[in-house]
Amino acid sequence: MTADNSVPSRLRNILVIAAALVLTILVVLGSRQPSAAASLASLAEQATPYEVAIANDRPMLLEFYADWCTSCQAMAGRIAALKQDYSDRLDFVMLNIDNDKWLPEVLDYNVDGIPQFVYLNGQGQPQGISIGELPRSVLAANLDALVEAQPLPYTNARGNLSEFSADLQPSRSSQTDPRSHSGQVQDGVLD
């Protein structure tokens, strides 16, 4: 092999190795990006507990959400950014509608679509509601007004949402005595 042939060959090998390294780095970094559901879960984990937020004198953004809600998942990044900007001035609270513990709050705030955002002043009084997937600018304008104790510019704003209705009827099985096996047999159905 001559010296002229080895230089292009080495250059080609170096380029192949560099391309492989770049692809490897991109794959590793890409796999580390949290999914929207993971971001929603981490937001909920880091949120101020409802009991704490309702007892203090700070304004609050109360979000009703569900893990399965695609609009909630899409909003997770915007909420995380807003939390970074506003967490020194207000509390961010997240209540999962799939947790029966929050049924009284779901009913109190008339949650009929998610995500639903309730803006509460420092005294815990609702100042407005926004429902669905909303632009960050709408949420930010409402939060600015909330911390300044001004009227919210975008109350009753509605974006894409996931419909929700609370099942207010107790399940049929809970109406029977748990010691009775008759609650397991349906009329006209034999095994």
Curated annotation (Swiss-Prot):
Residues 165-191 are annotated as: Disordered. GO terms for cellular component: plasma membrane. CDD domains: TxlA. It is found in: Cell membrane. Residues 27-148 form the Thioredoxin domain. It is a single-pass membrane protein. Residues 165-185 have a biased composition (Polar residues). GO terms for molecular function: oxidoreductase activity, acting on a sulfur group of donors, disulfide as acceptor. Its main location: membrane. Keywords: Cell membrane, Disulfide bond, Membrane, Redox-active center, Transmembrane, Transmembrane helix. Signal peptide: none annotated. Disulfide bonds join C69-C72. The chain crosses the membrane at residues 14-30. Belongs to the thioredoxin family. Required for disulfide bond formation in some proteins. Acts by transferring its disulfide bond to other proteins and is reduced in the process. PANTHER family: THIOREDOXIN-LIKE PROTEIN HCF164, CHLOROPLASTIC (PTHR47353:SF1). This is Thiol:disulfide interchange protein TxlA. The lineage of its organism: Bacteria, Bacillati, Cyanobacteriota, Cyanophyceae, Synechococcales.
